[in-house]
């Protein structure tokens, strides 16, 4: 599977063996009001555990986790 990964530049990369999920994790930091949420993209073997202040979405098809504010190619 291929997933988009951060940091910038955001690129689509092949995940390591056993990592068959893509994820998009978002949360607010001290600059959330001016910059918006922090966004982390990557690969995972299982959907990461969510802390109370985070949102996470997992998916299992190639490049299914595009940056929410960036247009898909």
UniProtKB/Swiss-Prot annotation:
Disulfide bond found in the keyword field = yes
Under Pfam families, the record lists:
Toxin_cobra-type (PF21947)
Species this chain originates from: Naja oxiana (Central Asian cobra)
InterPro entries, alphabetically? Snake_3FTx, Snake_toxin-like_sf, Snake_toxin_con_site, Toxin_cobra-type
> What is the recorded name of this protein?
Alpha-elapitoxin-Nno2a
Q: Where in the cell is it found?
A: Secreted
MF term (GO), any? ion channel regulator activity
Family in the record: Belongs to the three-finger toxin family. Long-chain subfamily. Type II alpha-neurotoxin sub-subfamily.
Which Gene3D superfamilies does this chain map to?
CD59
Q: Its principal location?
A: secreted
A single cellular component GO annotation: extracellular region
Keyword field: Acetylcholine receptor inhibiting toxin, Disulfide bond, Ion channel impairing toxin, Neurotoxin, Postsynaptic neurotoxin, Secreted, Toxin
On tissue specificity, the annotation reads:
Expressed by the venom gland.
The protein's role, per its UniProt record? Binds with high affinity to muscular (tested on Torpedo marmorata AChR, Kd=0.38 nM) and neuronal (tested on chimeric alpha-7/CHRNA7, Kd=12 nM) nicotinic acetylcholine receptor (nAChR) and inhibits acetylcholine from binding to the receptor, thereby impairing neuromuscular and neuronal transmission. The toxin also shows a very weak inhibition of GABA(A) receptors composed of alpha-1-beta-3-gamma-2 (GABRA1-GABRB3-GABRG2) subunits.
Say yes or no: keyword Secreted present: yes
Q: List the disulfide bonds.
A: 3-22, 15-43, 28-32, 47-58, 59-64
């Amino acid at each position: 599977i291929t997933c988009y990964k951060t940091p910038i530049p955001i690129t689509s990369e092949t995940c390591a063996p056993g990592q068959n999920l893509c994820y998009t994790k978002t949360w607010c930091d001290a600059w959330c009001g001016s910059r918006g949420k922090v966004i982390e993209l990557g690969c995972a073997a299982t959907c990461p555990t969510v802390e109370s202040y985070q949102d996470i979405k997992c998916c299992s098809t190639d490049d299914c986790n595009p940056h929410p504010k960036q247009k898909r190619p």
